[in-house]
Amino acid sequence: MSMQDPIADMLTRIRNGQAAKHVSVKMPSAKLKIAIAQMLKEEGYITDYAVADEAKPELEITLKYFQGQPVVETIQRVSRPGLRIYKGKNELPKVMGGLGVAIVSTSKGLMTDRTARQNGMGGEVICYVA
């Protein structure tokens, strides 16, 4: 069976892995997933990520915990294949009053809501992380 929404699958694997206190989670790799993992690492939500180059590339994300609790409190898909959500530069959401991050896909690539606001850009809101 084919996967309808690979990004939602990635976010669910991270959510479930942290709920089960796993050290890392593995999933099929894709360019967009790697870009999202890079953003999560830059923002401090995951420890690291690695791509295993095999016949089927696999993305492994090392999860991050603080005093035994997952660093990621909520990770939620916003724009999905059946309902795309686009926001202009003035409409970009502030997740948890600025404490969280919204990952936005713009014409210049993936960026956080803060970076998109600074660059005066809007785009497709991929997910919220807090």
UniProtKB/Swiss-Prot annotation:
The keyword rRNA-binding applies. GO terms for molecular function: rRNA binding; structural constituent of ribosome. Gene3D superfamilies: 3.30.1370.30, 3.30.1490.10. PROSITE patterns: RIBOSOMAL_S8. Keywords: Ribonucleoprotein, Ribosomal protein, RNA-binding, rRNA-binding. One of its GO terms (biological process) is translation. The keyword Cell wall biogenesis/degradation does not apply. GO terms for cellular component: ribonucleoprotein complex; ribosome. Coiled coil: none annotated. Part of the 30S ribosomal subunit. Contacts proteins S5 and S12. HAMAP family: Ribosomal_uS8_B (MF_01302_B). One of the primary rRNA binding proteins, it binds directly to 16S rRNA central domain where it helps coordinate assembly of the platform of the 30S subunit. Belongs to the universal ribosomal protein uS8 family. This is Small ribosomal subunit protein uS8. It comes from Shewanella halifaxensis (strain HAW-EB4).
